[in-house]
UniProtKB/Swiss-Prot annotation:
UniProt: L-serine binding residues: T233, A234, E235, E287, S387
Species for this entry: Clostridium tetani (strain Massachusetts / E88)
Pathway in which this enzyme or protein is active: Aminoacyl-tRNA biosynthesis; selenocysteinyl-tRNA(Sec) biosynthesis; L-seryl-tRNA(Sec) from L-serine and tRNA(Sec): step 1/1
Family named by the database record: Belongs to the class-II aminoacyl-tRNA synthetase family. Type-1 seryl-tRNA synthetase subfamily.
SUPFAM superfamilies in the record: Class II aaRS and biotin synthetases (SSF55681), tRNA-binding arm (SSF46589)
One GO CC term on file: cytoplasm
UniProt name for this protein: Serine--tRNA ligase
A Pfam family it matches: tRNA-synt_2b
Broad EC category: ligase
Gene: serS
Cellular compartment(s): Cytoplasm
Subunit structure: Homodimer. The tRNA molecule binds across the dimer.
Residue sites binding ATP per the record: R264, S265, E266, E351, I352, S353, S354
GO aspect biological process, one term: selenocysteine biosynthetic process
Domain notes: Consists of two distinct domains, a catalytic core and a N-terminal extension that is involved in tRNA binding.
Amino acid sequence: MLDLKRIRSNPEEIKKALAGRGEDFDVSVIDKVLQLDEERRNILVEVESLKNKRKQESAKIPQFKKEGKNVDDIMAEMKELAGKIKKLDERLSEIDGSIEYIMLRIPNIPNPNVPNGDSDEDNVEIRRWGEATTFEFEPKAHWDLGVNLDILDFERAGKVTGSRFTFYKGLGARLERAVINYYLDTHIDEHGYTEILPPYMVNRKSMTGTGQLPKFEEDAFRLEEQDYFLIPTAEVPVTNLYRDEILNGSDLPMKHVAYSACFRSEAGSAGRDTRGLVRQHQFNKVELVKFTKPEQSYEELEKLTKDAEDVLQGLGIPYRVVRICKGDLGFTAALKYDIEVWMPSYNRYVEISSCSNFEDFQSRRANIKYRENPKDKPNFVHTLNGSGVAVGRTVAAIIENFQQADGTIIIPEKLRPYMGGKDVIK
C-alpha cells in the first residue's frame, strides 16, 4: 500500500510513475483518492467544530441549572449537534472504506532503475552463468525422461487429482527431497538465514498484507467455511509472522528461509506450460524473506539474489539474471530480478526465482514497523523476498541438463550426500 501523504504531496509524480505499470491500472483513481481524502479532511474539521460547540453548550448547563434557568433549548441544540456529528461520522466511515478499497488496489511505485517496457520481452539481461547445455544426441524433455525412468507419474496424478499434478516416485521423490535439503542447508549454514516452517493455510488478513488480496483472489485456493487460503508461497506466512509488530532496529536485517508446498490455481494460464513440472497447482519451493531498514534494502536485495544464484551454481545449472521491466513487474514489487535456468526442451531460459524489493509496500499493508530506541517513533520496515529456489523446476532442470545419451541422469555432486551416495538415476 502506498503512503497517502505521498500521494497527496506529489499526485502527478505518482501518476507518472504508475503509468505503464502493466497492471491495467487507471491512474485516474489517484484523483478519486485525493477527492475522497479532501472530503474526509473537511468533514474532520467540521466534526471537530461541532464537538467544540457541543462542549461549549454542555458547559452552560450546570450554571443554568444553578440559576434556575430552563435548559430545554440547550438540550435540544445538543441533540441536534449529536445528530449532525453522527451523520458525519457515518460518512467518514464510508469514505474510509472507499479510500481503503482503492488504496489496496493501487500497485507499488517502480524504482527509478526499473527498465521501461510492456512485457517480458523488454526485460533486461544483467548477467549469465554457465553455458546453455548442448548435446551430441537428441535430448528428451523432462516429462518424457521422467516417465521413462519411472520417477515421475503425471497420468496417475491426473487420475487421482487432475491436471497439473504429479507423483514423484522412487529416486524422483528422493531427488526432490535432496534439492529441498540442499537449499535449506546452504541458506542456513552458509548464508545465515534462520529457518521457519510455516503453516500452509493463512487467513484473509495475511493474504492482504503481502498483496495477494484483493487483486489475485482468483489465483488462490480458498477454504470457504473458514475463509482460509492455501498459501501460494511461503512469503505470505513468513512476512505476516511480524504483522502488527514493532521490530528492534538492532535486529535488522532479519533473514528467514522457509520450505513449503505452494498452491496456485494458475487462473489465466490455460494452454501455457501444460506438460511437466513448470506450472503446477501444487509445487515445492524454498523461500527467502528479509526485513530491513529502508537504507539497507537495495544492498540486501543484491545479496538475496546472489544467495539464490549460489545454490544454482552449486548444482551446475546454467542460468541468467534479468531485471524486470515496468510492464512485467507485477503488483507488489518496486524492483525485481528474475533468475532463469536453461531448459533444453524449451530451448530458452525459464524463470526459477523472482527476487524482489517491496520497499514499504507490504509493511504498510501488514503494519510491520521498527525503531532503534524504545522512545523513537516507529518507521515501516522494507520487506524483500525471493525464491531460493523453486524445487520442481530445479528437478526439471536437472533432468534435462544432466541427461545422458543412454537415458540416464547424472546427479549433481552437491546432491549425492542427500541421495545415499548415488551418482546416477537409471
